[in-house]
Structure formats: structure tokens, C-alpha cells
Design a protein with these regions (language model features):
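Short helix- or helix-capping micro-motifs
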Residues: 119-130
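Short acidic/glycine- and proline-prone juxtamembrane loop motifs at membrane-interface regions
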Residues: 135-143
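Start-transfer (signal-anchor) and selected internal transmembrane alpha helices
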Residues: 1-24, 110, 116
């Protein structure tokens, strides 16, 4: 059992380092004025408006954001904007969400019968998958926050945990 605890620590560290790398790359892109207005700009404005108690009617789109994507996940993000309104919050949440996907991937690999070292390798494969890096680098998309949730739901279904599924 101790070995499994050590390995989840390894996967946890891999996830933390990956989140920092993902955040660093997307922040650098944003700092160099390479961010686009039609993704990060819209969500930055919408989350800011929600944090101020105003209706999320984007000036870019001209209508209520729920009429565009119905992205309910942006409402809790407004709490972060209460601390300090910055698009970097969105980039950080996205980076952490993507990096957290390594944990359920590791558990799924163990549940599928892979050895612990192979399960760690699968978590690393997830983190090194080019799509994970590219989706992080390209603006902000709230659906990315669902990646670890979907992987967790698959794990719950495979474990027969209907309540979590």
C-alpha cells in the first residue's frame, strides 16, 4: 500500500509541474499579445461582468452569454474575479483542469490491470499528449474544465460507483 501512495505522489507532482508549464506557456502567449478576442476576450469580459453582479452581455457578441454557449461553469469563476479581475485566472483554471486529468488516467490504468509503473507512464502519456498542450495554448474554453470530470466519471462507472457516475 505504501508503494501506491508513493506513486500517487509521483503522479501528483507530475500534474503540478504540468499545470505550471501549461500556465507558463499560456501566460507567456497572453503576455506577448497573442491572445484572441473571440475566446479569451469574451470569457474575460463575461466573467468580469458576472463578478460585478451585471448581466453577462458581451460587447463583442451583443447578447447574453447563456444564449451563446450556456456555459454555466463561468459563474463560479466569477468568485476568482472578486479577488482580482484578471484573464490569468481563466488560464490558470484551464491549466490546472487539464493537469488534473492525469490522476483519473492513472487510476483508470491501475483499474485496467496495468502495473504501477505502466500506470505512471499512462499518466505521463496523457500529460504529454499534444492535444492537451495545444488546447491549453489556444485561448480559454470552459469545456476543458470537464476533462478530469469525464475521466473521473468513466472511472466511477468502471468501479461500479453509480452514485459518482
Amino acid at each position: 500500500m505504501k508503494k501506491s501512495t508513493v506513486n500517487i505522489g509521483i503522479v501528483g507532482w507530475m500534474s503540478c509541474i504540468s499545470a505550471l508549464i501549461l500556465l507558463g506557456c499560456s501566460s507567456l502567449r497572453h503576455t506577448l499579445f497573442q491572445s484572441g478576442v473571440l475566446d479569451l476576450g469574451i470569457y474575460d469580459q463575461v466573467v468580469y461582468l458576472i463578478s460585478q453582479g451585471m448581466p453577462p452581455i458581451s460587447s463583442f457578441l451583443g447578447f447574453h452569454h447563456m444564449g451563446n454557449h450556456a456555459a454555466w461553469a463561468v459563474y463560479p469563476l466569477a468568485l476568482l474575479y472578486k479577488i482580482h479581475p484578471s484573464a490569468y485566472w481563466l488560464l490558470a483554471v484551464q491549466a490546472v483542469s487539464l493537469a488534473l486529468g492525469a490522476l483519473p488516467t492513472w487510476f483508470l490504468a491501475l483499474q485496467a490491470g496495468l502495473k504501477e509503473r505502466q500506470a505512471i507512464a499512462m499518466a505521463a502519456v496523457y500529460l504529454l499528449y499534444p492535444l492537451v498542450f495545444n488546447v491549453n495554448l489556444f485561448e480559454f474554453h470552459p469545456e476543458v474544465m470537464a476533462v478530469p470530470v469525464f475521466l473521473g466519471v468513466v472511472l466511477a462507472a468502471r468501479l461500479g460507483q453509480v452514485v459518482w457516475f
